[in-house]
């Protein structure tokens, strides 16, 4: 009986040693590219492409016929090939805050940003909609607004969030005359913005 017991135990030892090794390898592989695994769960809508920045920690989708362009002081930007005023852009700045809610209540934050940061002195701002959403434990403020000047008006969606020690802003917009036609398409872009852990 002693030989049977020792034989069974010796057969279990290699299996028991392999299990932690396999679990460790699995955890390592899963941690190498957590953003790709996260993005793979989401389906990119038809006629859109995904933009994923693994270094700076964010992702969003944009219309597949748009092209990349340089927009001063922004990390990424895409615009319509033919309608130059339709574009999406993302920028971020460092912050000590941990969550967008640390900035204040939704209504106060959005009102301040639109009136004092986004609008030029000659523009009249109008806020149409604002909402807070939580995705994977991260909080986002999204809002729709129009900036009207004597000669020109633009409409936009903005999504703001805080994570990775950064305050992120995504703005997607168009000329107000085209807004009704393209609004739903541009809302998909604004709603797709996600922070990735870096």
Task: Tell where the protein language model's regions lie, with residue ranges.
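Conserved polar/disulfide-associated segments of primarily extracytoplasmic proteins
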Residues: 41-47, 56, 68-168, 174-178, ...
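Cleavable N-terminal signal peptides
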Residues: 27, 37-38
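Extracytoplasmic/periplasm-facing segments of secreted or lipoprotein envelope proteins
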Residues: 62-63, 128
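Stable alpha-helical elements in mature extracytoplasmic
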Residues: 62, 109, 182-189
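Compact beta-sheet-dominated globular domain cores
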Residues: 165, 186-189, 196
């Amino acid at each position: 009986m002693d030989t049977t017991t020792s034989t069974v135990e010796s057969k279990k030892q290699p299996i028991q040693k392999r299990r932690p090794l396999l679990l460790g390898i699995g955890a390592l592989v899963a941690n190498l590219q957590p953003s790709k695994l996260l993005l793979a769960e989401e389906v990119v809508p038809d006629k859109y492409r995904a933009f994923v920045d693994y270094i700076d920690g964010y992702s969003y989708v944009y219309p597949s016929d748009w092209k990349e362009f340089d927009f001063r002081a922004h990390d990424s930007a895409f615009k319509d090939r033919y309608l130059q005023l339709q574009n999406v852009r993302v920028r971020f700045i460092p912050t000590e805050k941990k969550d967008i809610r640390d900035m204040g209540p939704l209504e106060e934050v959005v009102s301040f940003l639109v009136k004092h940061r986004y609008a030029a002195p000659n523009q009249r701002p109008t806020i149409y909609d604002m909402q807070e959403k939580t995705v994977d434990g991260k909080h986002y403020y999204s809002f729709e607004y129009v900036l009207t000047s004597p000669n020109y008006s633009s409409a936009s969606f903005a999504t703001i969030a805080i994570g990775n020690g950064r305050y992120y802003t995504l703005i997607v917009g168009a000329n107000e005359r085209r807004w009704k036609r393209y609004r739903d398409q541009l809302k998909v872009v604004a709603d797709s913005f996600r922070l990735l852990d870096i």
